[in-house]
Amino acid sequence: MADESSDAAGEPQPAPAPVRRRSSANYRAYATEPHAKKKSKISASRKLQLKTLMLQIAKQEMEREAEERRGEKGRVLRTRCQPLELDGLGFEELQDLCRQLHARVDKVDEERYDVEAKVTKNITEIADLTQKIYDLRGKFKRPTLRRVRISADAMMQALLGTRAKESLDLRAHLKQVKKEDIEKENREVGDWRKNIDALSGMEGRKKKFEG
């Protein structure tokens, strides 16, 4: 018994099998096995009813805001454009009243001009900031491009500039041979037998045999 216990103690015991977590096993089973889709708790008619109700509420809010704007505009007009009292006024008083009205009109025009300048400045700043954001994100607005037919020469001219003409002119470095020189060379090549006969003295003897 002692020997068996010593042998058992000396042998290495096998490593235990890895234990899988239930979460991964459940996820694998959920992904592989078919399962029915969950039904929505709200029916289609109920969804349509809720959408209609939301649209009605939004319409009421818009109408209320428009009514508030109209009321604010009327209040401002009543404050700034008070009714004129012209009864019992003389000529000079009417002239003074006209001058006052013209001064008020000029003041309102100045205020309107200042407000328009501020609005334009704000719009420009917003556009600049938006462009900076696009630049930082790396999202550039691509312009609309149209197809243009271009020849190979024009393409090389656009790419290489002044060097395009030099690169395309491939015959510039070749030796130019005139037509007269070619005819002269052909004539000389064709008469080589006559030249040999004249040099060897055989020209006169050929004439005797031919005669």
From Swiss-Prot:
<feature type="modified residue" description="Phosphoserine; by PKC/PRKCE">
    <location>
        <position position="43"/>
    </location>
</feature>
<dbReference type="GO" id="GO:0019855">
    <property type="term" value="F:calcium channel inhibitor activity"/>
</dbReference>
<feature type="modified residue" description="Phosphoserine; by PKA and PKD/PRKD1">
    <location>
        <position position="23"/>
    </location>
</feature>
<feature type="modified residue" description="N-acetylalanine">
    <location>
        <position position="2"/>
    </location>
</feature>
<dbReference type="InterPro" id="IPR021666">
    <property type="entry name" value="Troponin-I_N"/>
</dbReference>
<dbReference type="GO" id="GO:0030017">
    <property type="term" value="C:sarcomere"/>
</dbReference>
<dbReference type="GO" id="GO:0055010">
    <property type="term" value="P:ventricular cardiac muscle tissue morphogenesis"/>
</dbReference>
<dbReference type="GO" id="GO:1990584">
    <property type="term" value="C:cardiac Troponin complex"/>
</dbReference>
<dbReference type="GO" id="GO:0031014">
    <property type="term" value="F:troponin T binding"/>
</dbReference>
<feature type="modified residue" description="Phosphothreonine; by STK4/MST1">
    <location>
        <position position="144"/>
    </location>
</feature>
<dbReference type="GO" id="GO:0007507">
    <property type="term" value="P:heart development"/>
</dbReference>
<comment type="similarity">
    <text>Belongs to the troponin I family.</text>
</comment>
<feature type="modified residue" description="Phosphothreonine">
    <location>
        <position position="79"/>
    </location>
</feature>
<feature type="modified residue" description="Phosphoserine">
    <location>
        <position position="5"/>
    </location>
</feature>
<feature type="region of interest" description="Involved in binding TNC and actin">
    <location>
        <begin position="130"/>
        <end position="151"/>
    </location>
</feature>
<dbReference type="GO" id="GO:0006940">
    <property type="term" value="P:regulation of smooth muscle contraction"/>
</dbReference>
<dbReference type="GO" id="GO:0019904">
    <property type="term" value="F:protein domain specific binding"/>
</dbReference>
<dbReference type="GO" id="GO:0006941">
    <property type="term" value="P:striated muscle contraction"/>
</dbReference>
<dbReference type="GO" id="GO:0051015">
    <property type="term" value="F:actin filament binding"/>
</dbReference>
<dbReference type="GO" id="GO:0005737">
    <property type="term" value="C:cytoplasm"/>
</dbReference>
<keyword id="KW-0597">Phosphoprotein</keyword>
<feature type="region of interest" description="Involved in binding TNC">
    <location>
        <begin position="33"/>
        <end position="80"/>
    </location>
</feature>
<feature type="modified residue" description="Phosphoserine">
    <location>
        <position position="167"/>
    </location>
</feature>
<keyword id="KW-0514">Muscle protein</keyword>
<dbReference type="GO" id="GO:0097512">
    <property type="term" value="C:cardiac myofibril"/>
</dbReference>
<feature type="site" description="Involved in TNI-TNT interactions">
    <location>
        <position position="98"/>
    </location>
</feature>
<feature type="modified residue" description="Phosphoserine">
    <location>
        <position position="151"/>
    </location>
</feature>
<protein>
    <recommendedName>
        <fullName>Troponin I, cardiac muscle</fullName>
    </recommendedName>
</protein>
<feature type="site" description="Involved in TNI-TNT interactions">
    <location>
        <position position="81"/>
    </location>
</feature>
<dbReference type="GO" id="GO:0006937">
    <property type="term" value="P:regulation of muscle contraction"/>
</dbReference>
<dbReference type="GO" id="GO:0001570">
    <property type="term" value="P:vasculogenesis"/>
</dbReference>
<dbReference type="Pfam" id="PF11636">
    <property type="entry name" value="Troponin-I_N"/>
</dbReference>
<dbReference type="GO" id="GO:0030172">
    <property type="term" value="F:troponin C binding"/>
</dbReference>
<dbReference type="GO" id="GO:0010882">
    <property type="term" value="P:regulation of cardiac muscle contraction by calcium ion signaling"/>
</dbReference>
<feature type="modified residue" description="Phosphoserine; by PKC/PRKCE">
    <location>
        <position position="45"/>
    </location>
</feature>
<feature type="modified residue" description="Phosphothreonine; by STK4/MST1">
    <location>
        <position position="130"/>
    </location>
</feature>
<feature type="modified residue" description="Phosphotyrosine">
    <location>
        <position position="27"/>
    </location>
</feature>
<feature type="region of interest" description="Disordered">
    <location>
        <begin position="1"/>
        <end position="24"/>
    </location>
</feature>
<dbReference type="GO" id="GO:0030049">
    <property type="term" value="P:muscle filament sliding"/>
</dbReference>
<feature type="modified residue" description="Phosphothreonine; by STK4/MST1">
    <location>
        <position position="52"/>
    </location>
</feature>
<feature type="modified residue" description="Phosphoserine">
    <location>
        <position position="6"/>
    </location>
</feature>
<feature type="modified residue" description="Phosphoserine">
    <location>
        <position position="200"/>
    </location>
</feature>
